[in-house]
Regions:
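Conserved catalytic-core segment of NTP-binding enzymes
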Residues: 182-262
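Phosphate-binding loop that captures ATP/GTP phosphates
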Residues: 86, 115-175, 194, 239
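Walker A/P-loop phosphate-binding motif and the immediately C-terminal alpha-helix
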Residues: 62-140, 225
Length: 262
């Protein structure tokens, strides 16, 4: 359903931008993210898990069924985040999902987005920054032994990242809850911390969460990130909290790709 002239345009754009065919087509507006993802899956462009595979929670639907409506929504979010990060190196983006009192829905979104990134962009690292209430380890059924907390405290001999059952996706769990580790998160840009991990060709997605009554300095924490998507919960997230976070991100020139109301 693409004309030969369009295919030529896509190939030229992909070559110039260093992008795969599907992403180049999305950038040019010739394919929407939903169609591109389904085509890629049908072509065997990325492996899927069989229904009932116990290695990943079924809530991470993108790992099982790219045609699912939720998976399509997640691909659209990915496309918006990549568009917001258009001035960055598309091969190794630093993205974040930021939950403002949004509950489990935000963690589920982050897990699905990481899967879609691994499927469409290649090697991806998902990092659980919610040290006080980790959740991504349960969704990917990875033991939360050593993780970000140990990495920040300098007690990890090796980078504490675990391979998930999803091809190309690694998970750095939150690690064991520690007040000192939690305070370290707020003291410096995570982008600078991640730069020291040596994963120059790996895209990264960080999951962060703020709960009612907290005033986390997300602007300084996420300085240097390519794009952020905010997740709020209808009827739960206070408008004042959301406004404060948005203003803080704006002060640090952090690109906000959009917001999701769970």
């Amino acid at each position: 359903f693409l004309a030969e002239t369009d295919i030529g345009r896509i190939e030229a754009h992909g070559h110039a931008a260093g992008q795969p065919f599907q992403q180049a087509a999305i950038d040019l507006g010739l394919l929407d993210p939903e169609t591109a993802g389904i085509i890629l899956a049908m072509q065997g462009g990325f492996p899927l898990l069989a229904a009932g595979d116990q290695r990943v929670d079924p809530l991470v639907v993108s790992a099982f069924d790219p045609a699912d409506a939720y998976a399509a929504k997640v691909r659209t979010i990915r496309a918006k985040m990549r568009a917001a990060a258009k001035d960055s190196d598309g091969a190794a983006l630093r993205l974040a999902i930021l939950s403002i009192d949004a509950g489990d829905e935000a963690a589920i979104l982050a897990a699905n987005l990481a899967v879609v990134m691994a499927q469409m962009d290649g090697q991806t690292m998902l990092v659980d920054v919610d040290i006080d209430r980790p959740s991504l380890d349960r969704l990917f059924r990875v033991a939360n032994k050593a993780g970000l907390a140990e990495q920040l405290l300098g007690s990890a001999a090796l980078l504490p990242a675990a391979r998930t059952a999803v091809d190309g996706l690694w998970l750095m769990t939150a690690g064991r809850a520690s007040g000192s580790a939690s305070s370290l998160v707020t003291k410096g840009p995570l982008a600078d911390t991640a730069a020291g991990w040596g994963l120059h060709d790996t895209s990264m997605l960080f999951y962060l969460a703020q709960r009612r009554g907290e005033q986390t300095p997300f602007g300084s924490i996420l300085a240097g990130f390519d794009a952020v998507t905010i997740v709020a919960r209808r009827g739960e997230t206070a408008i004042a909290d959301m406004r404060r976070v948005i203003d803080d991100l704006d002060r640090h020139n952090i690109s906000i790709a959009g917001s999701v109301i769970a």
